[in-house]
């Protein structure tokens, strides 16, 4: 009897233990399952986010391509001439989204060539060439010429460089690199693919000239360590590089010494005299003249320059050629003319003269006339009216985008500016 009772007691205790152990085991299992579920859900959510992010990275460029294709079907491009395969050239324009470069792009596209624009958008703007995006003959590449470029082309227009005083003084080292390393890279490309290269040089290589007007055989009167030297000397070195490659490597080069140019797509606050005067007159602010205003400049309209660049590229002239308008005016005359054309009540304000500001600049273009059959044809007032119209539209655009530009002086010395 005792043994049976004891057995039942032990059996009862074992059942209770088993139930307890089973309960603990079930609880532990449930806790483990819940923990794994929560962990897996977290991993899944993170994974889904990562996958979605990766998919978005892949899909976004495709969306952009689709938008460009849709635009190409609906967009009306400027009229383009048809050229045969033999006559159509593959042309590279460095700095092609800039002021002059974008007008050159228009000219070459409308002439029927295949144009590749390379720009790092330091001063260039996509807006300047967006009307060609999607066209089968056009390609836009975001690239800095200080890095090598590998592309098959027949001609290279090397325009890449900051060209207005505020821009090249803001980053003089970048300006030097663009005009030296960038030019070396483009010459190396021209050598590899057998292309002809045109360097957009500048009248600044003449410095503050002691000879007037300036012809191509004048060596200049320059300050190699002055505030503008990064640009002036950069272009002088670029010319030297071109002729070294021509003599040693047989590269075909053309060098255009470009004088003051104006027209639509100029930056309104780039610190140049024409853009400054137009912007000040439109905004009713004083037109700032540095010094007495007796300094002289000769301004050409941008379409004249573009025609000159194309004529030079397709010529047999390998020595430097001046491209500019020999019609000379004082800075004060420009201020008064722009004020009258705008119909502005702005006053003319005289400020202290800037350091290294050339007193006279006027091109001798006999060589261009004789060897290229080129000379400017757009009258000054006609060109200024076109520029003023563009600036009015640009001010409206900027106002709609909550940005009102102000004339931007070149920082030279104690806040002084210069006439470019």
UniProtKB/Swiss-Prot annotation:
It holds the Pfam family GDP_Man_Dehyd. The chain crosses the membrane at residues 20-40. It catalyses: UDP-alpha-D-glucuronate + H(+) = UDP-alpha-D-xylose + CO2. Pathway: Nucleotide-sugar biosynthesis; UDP-alpha-D-xylose biosynthesis; UDP-alpha-D-xylose from UDP-alpha-D-glucuronate: step 1/1. The modification Phosphothreonine is found at residue 94. GO terms for cellular component: catalytic complex; cytoplasm; Golgi cisterna membrane; Golgi membrane. Belongs to the NAD(P)-dependent epimerase/dehydratase family. UDP-glucuronic acid decarboxylase subfamily. This is UDP-glucuronic acid decarboxylase 1. It comes from Rattus norvegicus. The lineage of its organism: Eukaryota, Metazoa, Chordata, Craniata, Vertebrata. The gene is Uxs1.
């Amino acid at each position: 009897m005792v043994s049976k009772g004891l057995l039942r007691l032990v059996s009862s205790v074992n059942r209770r233990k088993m139930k307890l152990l089973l309960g603990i085991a079930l609880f532990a299992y449930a806790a483990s399952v819940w923990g794994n579920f929560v962990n897996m859900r977290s991993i899944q959510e993170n994974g889904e986010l990562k996958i979605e992010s990766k998919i978005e990275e892949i899909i976004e460029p495709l969306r952009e391509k689709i938008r460009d294709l849709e635009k190409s079907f609906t967009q009306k491009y400027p009229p383009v001439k048809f050229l045969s395969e033999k006559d159509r050239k593959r042309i590279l324009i460095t700095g092609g989204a800039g002021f002059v470069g974008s007008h050159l792009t228009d000219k070459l596209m409308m002439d029927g060539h295949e144009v590749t624009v390379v720009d790092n958008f330091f001063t260039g703007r996509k807006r300047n060439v967006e009307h060609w995006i999607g066209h089968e003959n056009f390609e836009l590449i975001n690239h800095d010429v200080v890095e090598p470029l590998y592309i098959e082309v027949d001609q290279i227009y090397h325009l890449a460089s900051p060209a207005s005083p505020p821009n090249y003084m803001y980053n003089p080292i970048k300006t030097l690199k663009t005009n030296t390393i960038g030019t070396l890279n483009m010459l190396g490309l021209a050598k590899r693919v057998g292309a002809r290269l045109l360097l957009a040089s500048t009248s600044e290589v003449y410095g503050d000239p002691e000879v007037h007007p300036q012809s191509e055989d004048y060596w200049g009167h320059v300050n190699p360590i002055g505030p503008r030297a990064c640009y002036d000397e950069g272009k002088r070195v670029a010319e030297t590089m071109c002729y070294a490659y021509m003599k040693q490597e047989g590269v075909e080069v053309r060098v255009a010494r470009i004088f003051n140019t104006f027209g639509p797509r100029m930056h309104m606050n780039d610190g140049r005299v024409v853009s400054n005067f137009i912007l000040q007159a439109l905004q009713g602010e004083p037109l700032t003249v540095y010094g007495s205003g007796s300094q002289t400049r000769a301004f050409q309209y941008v379409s004249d320059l573009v025609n000159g660049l194309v004529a030079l590229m397709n010529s047999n002239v390998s020595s430097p050629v001046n491209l500019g308008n020999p019609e000379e005016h004082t800075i004060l005359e420009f201020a008064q003319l722009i004020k009258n054309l705008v119909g502005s009540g702005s006053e003319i304000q005289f400020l202290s003269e800037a350091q290294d500001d050339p007193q006279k600049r006027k091109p001798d273009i006999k060589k261009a006339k004789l060897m290229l059959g080129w000379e400017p044809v757009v009258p000054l007032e006609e060109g200024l009216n076109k520029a003023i119209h563009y600036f009015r539209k640009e001010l409206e655009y900027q106002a709609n985008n909550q940005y009102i530009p102000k004339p931007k002086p070149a920082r030279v010395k104690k806040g002084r500016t210069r006439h470019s």
